[in-house]
């Protein structure tokens, strides 16, 4: 039995038309939908808990595994200039953000041990899955292959998430990092220790960053799509479009430039660019640091007052020195 309730404004009673596009029956444990996928990515992938990942602890908390329409992608929780905790997830346009209304976004799907790179097997995290179901489409554009959705609910404080920062200048990064879920596996981290290269893909000029080859024996795979690329200053500068990188080769990956996604390649409407959503205050900022909603902030509400002291002596004492 299914009960559907429709609430109408007083002046629209009886005038609404209800369409139900599909019905999803969640009869299986979320981990069984596509399996845990632990250790299904290439053995060269590096768990985020390994020592190389420690400087990226905050950014790691922003990355989610996306299960949508029977496929897997990666997304990143991003900050906006209002810093109001709006739960925007940045991913790839080819991950179909328009159809993520029933997607499952899993946070903190990380191995508790450094078991990657053929050292030992990675492990699934213990406890209940930290998930949020469903999102609303916000914006996307094929030119730089970006997608933006808003989660149906704000991640609870217990998830200990981080809203990642970004840079929209298009400046070339000296090094780069990608945090992702290759093949839907537990979260991994990849390193490009060389400057990014400009690239043109899909007939669009200068729309991508090219990672010529990954260092530290790392890579990306299917399921990594949509994952963010961070520069040396921990700002997002791109999202994964695709490439030929894999364990055992030295081939390239390509990331849609955040700077082009910002304007949507001069798109005419807000649903084709990031700027309206990630800069709702119209600040004009070219970069924004990330933040943790669990970190208390101090209000700048102090004032300075003049205090007139009386010249009267209220008390006095004489203490002899022995």
What are these regions (language model features)?
Residues 1-213:
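Serine endopeptidase catalytic core focused on the charge-relay Asp
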């Amino acid at each position: 039995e299914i009960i559907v309730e429709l609430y109408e404004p007083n002046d629209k009673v009886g005038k609404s038309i209800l369409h139900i596009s599909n019905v999803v029956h969640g009869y299986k444990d979320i981990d069984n939908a596509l399996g845990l996928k632990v250790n299904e990515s290439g053995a060269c992938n590096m768990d985020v808990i390994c020592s190389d990942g420690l400087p990226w602890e905050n950014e790691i908390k922003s990355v989610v595994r996306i299960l949508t329409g029977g496929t897997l992608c990666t997304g990143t929780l991003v900050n906006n200039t209002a810093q109001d905790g709006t739960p925007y997830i940045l991913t790839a346009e080819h991950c179909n953000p328009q159809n993520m209304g029933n997607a499952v976004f899993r946070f903190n799907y990380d191995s508790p041990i450094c078991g990657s790179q053929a050292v030992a097997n990675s492990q699934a995290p213990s406890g209940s899955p930290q998930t949020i179901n469903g999102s609303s489409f916000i914006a996307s554009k094929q030119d730089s292959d970006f997608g933006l959705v808003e989660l149906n609910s704000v991640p609870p404080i217990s998830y200990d998430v981080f809203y990642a920062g970004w840079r929209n200048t298009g400046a070339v990064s000296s090094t780069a990092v990608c945090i992702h879920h290759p093949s839907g596996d537990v979260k991994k981290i990849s390193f490009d220790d060389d400057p990014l290269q400009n690239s043109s893909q899909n007939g669009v000029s200068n729309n991508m960053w090219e990672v010529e080859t990954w260092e530290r024996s790392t890579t990306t795979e299917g399921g990594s799509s949509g994952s963010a690329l961070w520069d040396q200053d921990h700002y997002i500068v791109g999202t994964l479009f695709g490439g030929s990188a894999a364990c055992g080769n030295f081939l390239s990956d390509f990331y849609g430039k955040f700077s082009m996604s910002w304007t949507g390649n001069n798109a005419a409407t807000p649903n084709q660019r990031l700027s309206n959503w990630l800069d709702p205050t119209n600040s004009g900022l070219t970069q924004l640091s990330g933040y943790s909603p669990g970190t208390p902030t101090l209000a700048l509400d102090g004032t300075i007052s003049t205090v007139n002291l009386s010249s009267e002596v209220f008390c006095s004492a004489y203490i002899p020195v022995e």
